């Protein structure tokens, strides 16, 4: 399976961690997610690490939510404007740009403490969640939520990150 072409914009120094190669960690996790949803074409995306002020600003402007959040997804192809990717399936150079994630490590860290999950698990949960949104998954309706959280849980489990007892049906489980 081809790697995902990820462009990083790190406004907070998250990737400067000397203890872990986050880019490799993220790539391995997202390749599992890509495989789980049956995507075999080339993908490109951006991941932006932002502080709480920037997360709050984006969340307020685009989602009308007056607080910082862990991840915000901006899918390139969504709804009526989607293109038929079948026309490009035989083009080995075509990369589907799925969109942009804005992640706030400090909110993820706070959530990991609130939920008792640990940072790795919460970060994995959050980035897979955003990746699935970029690929058209949602959790507004119960059947959509069950599918999305089921995929999310399987990917986390396959990666060795802990699950809650009802992770495969209910998301965070708390």
UniProtKB/Swiss-Prot annotation:
Protein name, per record: Endoribonuclease YbeY
Matches recorded under PROSITE patterns: UPF0054
Function: Single strand-specific metallo-endoribonuclease involved in late-stage 70S ribosome quality control and in maturation of the 3' terminus of the 16S rRNA.
Matching NCBIfam families: rRNA maturation RNase YbeY
Places the protein is found: Cytoplasm
Top-level EC class: hydrolase
Keywords assigned by UniProt, alphabetized: Cytoplasm, Endonuclease, Hydrolase, Metal-binding, Nuclease, Ribosome biogenesis, rRNA processing, Zinc
Family recorded in the similarity comment: Belongs to the endoribonuclease YbeY family.
Domain of life: Bacteria
Gene Ontology MF, one: RNA endonuclease activity
A GO CC annotation given for this chain: cytoplasm
Positions bound to Zn(2+): 129, 133, 139
Cofactor binding annotation: Binds 1 zinc ion.
UniProt-listed InterPro entries: MetalPrtase_cat_dom_sf_prd, YbeY, YbeY_CS
Organism this protein belongs to: Lactobacillus acidophilus (strain ATCC 700396 / NCK56 / N2 / NCFM)
Pfam families on file: YbeY (PF02130)
EC number: 3.1.-.-
Keyword Nucleotide-binding: no
This protein's encoding gene: ybeY
């Amino acid at each position: 399976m081809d790697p995902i072409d990820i462009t990083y914009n790190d406004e907070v120094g998250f990737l400067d961690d000397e203890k872990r190669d986050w880019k490799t960690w993220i790539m391995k996790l997202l390749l599992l997610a890509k495989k789980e949803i049956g995507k075999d074409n080339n993908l490109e995306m951006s991941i932006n690490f932002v502080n709480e002020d920037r997360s709050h600003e984006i969340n307020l402007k685009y989602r009308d939510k007056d607080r910082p959040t862990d991840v915000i997804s901006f899918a390139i192809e969504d709804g009526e404007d989607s293109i038929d990717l079948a026309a490009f399936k035989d083009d080995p150079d075509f990369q589907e740009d799925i969109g942009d994630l804005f992640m706030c490590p400090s909110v993820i860290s706070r959530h990991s403490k609130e939920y008792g999950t640990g940072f790795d698990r919460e970060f994995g949960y959050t980035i897979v969640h955003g990746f699935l949104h970029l690929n058209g998954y949602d959790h507004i309706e119960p059947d959509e939520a069950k599918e999305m959280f089921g995929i999310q849980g399987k990917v986390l489990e396959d990666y060795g990150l802990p699950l809650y007892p009802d992770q495969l049906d209910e998301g965070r489980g708390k």
